[in-house]
Amino acid sequence: LTVKTVATTGSLKDAAGNAMTSFDIGTNLAAQSGKTIVVETTRPTVLNITSTKNNGTYGVGEDINVRVTFSEAVTLSGAGAKISVPLETGDNDATVEINSVSNSATADGIYTVLEGHTTDGSDLTAKSKPTLVGTLKDHPAGNEIVDAGLDIPGGQNLADTKNIKIDAVYPTITNVTSTTADGTYKIGDDINLTLSFSEELTLANGTLDVTLNHGNTDNAKQSINAFTDKSSITGTYTVAVNDTSNNLDHTSIALGGSGTLKDGGGNQPQSWAPTNQTLGQNKNIKIDGNRPKVLKIRSSKPAGFYKVGDVIPIQIYFTEAVSTTAANILKATLETGSTNTDAVVTFGAIDNSGIATQDYTVRTNDLNPALTVNSIAVSGGQRVNDQAGNEMTDKSIPTGKNLADEIVDIYVDGVLPVDDGTAITMTTKGGNVVADKYN
């Protein structure tokens, strides 16, 4: 403290009546030893809200520094004294409490991110100005901050000074569906799989495995490879032999290998079940990965002897209803003895039937005491398909299911008797004898 001038509006005299004519200061107050006096009446104020934490997105359990900067060094005192900084963290707002400040222009507290906290893509900010319990005075003058001094200046909130985002909401799989139309699909068909998430996720260091309910463990797991910042992702399931489902659905979703599936805050799904609907609830996709096969060979004729000209229906039973891509392409070769070439029965067009029937007419010199089918073939590059379009590639007849197994002793005898010139001697036993006749 220094005296600037000394003056009077009247007169100043000594005891003898001499008037004082000079008011020059000989030794000022500040120059005197031990007389350093400082006068300071400016109240402290908040300059900004900031953080020592690096910019970025943070999830559950992360500790984030929140710093209040003042215009000068201050000290917090009083019973239960604290500075509270309310933060905007979604439906459940957080509050940072600072309990100790001693002769410092900054006051630091820690905000620990809790499950459910979010800034919804915005930067973390103080929801309102700090509140004070106790007193906050500057040092050393002791000027106390007032309520107006706690106001955050424009452009100086936490969101202005830092770019910190909070994402502590666990992501979920919201939906599993397919862009593939409802219907029945065969071997080799591709089925789209689409998974939707509650927010953008990143899959790293592994796969996202979707297990399907078609019953074939060798092809059940469909793996989706790594992706970055996707709110939905697609995969492709290719129908394989032995896949079967009346309503394609997933039985589980899981990470494969060392995979991680995280949102921007590092949060992973806590449940792998869709929050809305499953594939089977969204779609009506049927899978038929079974190729049709020959089930058995039969005939409507009973066991017995059959001669030249007799007609024997040959019936091929299939494991499911089939259709041919053209008429007269399905052929069955019968074992009709060594004298003739084996008979070939050609079947007409088949349209969604589990049985194909065609007549075999016994030829001269056909001979087999137990008629059977040697082989079944499809000619002309044509196909026998089931209703899903799966081709019958295996045309073998199951063991124990051939015609001779199903109906024993269909005896084909097309060999005509002949006179080989051998003399026949007959002896009359009695009765009339008719000339030129056997008696």
Predicted regions and their residues:
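Non-catalytic beta-sheet/beta-sandwich ligand-binding modules that flank or precede catalytic cores
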Residues: 1-439
